[in-house]
Amino acid sequence: MQYWSNLANDALYRCRATSIVLTYLTDSVAGDGALPHRLVNLGMHVVAAFLVAGLGVWRRIGFRLSVPAAAFFALREAHQEAVIWVAALPEVLAFVFVLAAVLSWIRWLDTRRPLWGAASLVAFVLGLLSKESAAVFPAFAVLIWWLEARNWRAPVAMIALFGVLDALYAYSIFSAKDNHLHLNDGTFTVQLGFLWTMVHSTLRLLWPWGAVALALLAWKGIRIWKSHLAGALVWIVIALLPYSFLTYMDRVPSRHTYLASVGIAVLMGCAWQTVREMRSTAVAAVALAAVLTHNLGYLWTKKYDQYQRRVEPTERFLRYAASNKGPVRITCAPYGYEVFRQAAAIRLGWSPEQVLGPNETPPAGEPAEYCDTSKP
């Protein structure tokens, strides 16, 4: 019970409770090696892609759009950092629960059955326990209702309930500001610069395939898709908004575009349907080959090289540490010494006190000094 109490009292990590529990279960069943955790991330990505396909239950979209949209989402290179990077599991889990809430919401709007309303509520709460970005779900709920306002009664009570949960969630975070890591380390700040971050990130997200889809739809007749395009673009803005207050970059990092990528996927679903209506096998084959070549090629060349460069400082330290048997003092490194400490604990079975920060004192003996000035 002490562990649960500690988690509940941690303003940052209680908002990542689902990933902590899933990681614990993975460690318990399969060990703390990298492969099981990578497979968990990959498995959740597959679930996420199926949930995108599930948007076909919404008659406005239908499976003729949602299935190709899901295929594009599964293969799109831009957000794969959330899949490959084990530490980004909260991002993927938040997506899964938000999409589950969206699908349940659509069914509730269509049927008004209490079970669907309850499912949407539960999925939303699980999303909030996965990452703070799940708080955008009420905005998605309003967007979906607005697009179908002439067909569905105004769900005022349910949206108000979602809003109350969001308000309580925000209060629980900001009331613990003094102890919240990301509210004290300069990661986020409320300032007008978020507008540029939003615009910059949206344009980057649309490039290149969102731009190609918009150009194709404009050429072939954008009017029949106007509600889809409006909904997709508003979805993107809503999903990017929580990350637009970041201070360490002028754009939203690619792993944080995972939820926003649904908007691009819908645009590509519309574009694929337009290509199919041309009734040209050659055009369809060229379009499919171009999408696959770009996304898979980019992922396995440029992105793969990027991932390799990022992990090399840690691998280099582990090789050094294994040959020295510890303790080691980190005097300079491209990442915080805590990264090396955790890596040594997992890979080498070292105790935490065997990897020291620049000003830490070892319990016994003189530590070897390690300095890495590389910039991966």
Specify the residue positions occupied by each region the protein language model found.
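Polytopic membrane enzymes that build or remodel cell-surface glycoconjugates and lipids
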Residues: 1-376
